[in-house]
Structure formats: structure tokens, C-alpha cells
Amino acid sequence: MIYDDNKFETIASIPDMRERTIILNGFSKYYAMTGWRIGYIVCDKSLMDPLMRLSFYSISCPNTFVQRAAVSALKEDDRASREMVAEYQRRRDYMCRELNMLKGCRCDKPSGAFYIFLDIRETGLSSEAFCQLMLNKHFVTMTPGHVFGDNCEGFVRISYANSMENLEIAMKRMNEALETL
């Protein structure tokens, strides 16, 4: 899922890379099948047997309805997915504009997915303390950056995979929280 007319180019399209590339992908984001835990592997035939032996017990036997949904997603027109990507882009633009107006916060526009990595270092709070404040006092949830590695301390990850109404409420609450710091 990418925005702003950016183009994705797989490494497999580079000369001599196709046979050396392993693509692992799923249906969660683009086909709105989050939590269904189904995906696929694209690789050179010589790599398939070792990969299947390695992963068989952790990825085998998805539910029948999930398998059928994945097949349908691949066969059907992706108009609904394209419309959802456009909606996510609209939400991303709104969130970035609003988040960049918050006291002590800054973010760049992500080129894909539905998460924003918000820089909160100017607030003086750790990412954990920031998340606890937002959740416990203002009922807005997000993920502290430190869970993504030590270099991500001072950031929080915010999802905009929600309704515009809820995102507007979250922005109002975050603004109120930061005005009291």
C-alpha cells in the first residue's frame, strides 16, 4: 500500500535478481484481511522445498474461509482496495496536518501503510510515559517507539486505520493533553 502516485518496484525486477529473491507477503493490509494470517511466498523453485520444510508447522492449515477469501481477493477487481488506499491517504493527510500542529510533536508523511511515527522528543516525555498519559487520562492508544528498538525512543506509532470521526476525537484529546504539559 503506497500513496501519492509513488511506484513500487520489486527487487525481483532488477536483472539477475529474480532467482535470488524471496518475496513474503500477506493479505492483511491491501485486502483488509487483518488478523486472518494468510500470505504467500514467491521464489525460485529451487528454494521452495527448503522454505516449506522450515515453515510448514507455523503456516500450514489456515481456515477454509480464509483460503477462499484470499483466492477471491486475487481473482476479483481490486477497486475496493484502491478506494480504501485513497481513504487511508486522506486520513494520513489529515493526521499529519493535525499532529504537526500539536505542541512538541512533529511527523513526516509516510509513503505507505497506515501508521505515523510521531516525534515526541520536544515534549520531554519518554515514549512509554507519553503513551500512558494518552491512554490513561485521554483514552487515546498508540505504541511506544522503544518497542521497535532503542533508536526509536522518543517516538510513538499511531495508526490511522480508524474512522475519521474517531481520528478527529483523538486529535482533540491529544491537543488537550499536550496543552497541560
What role is predicted for each listed range?
Residues 1-181:
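PLP-dependent class I/II
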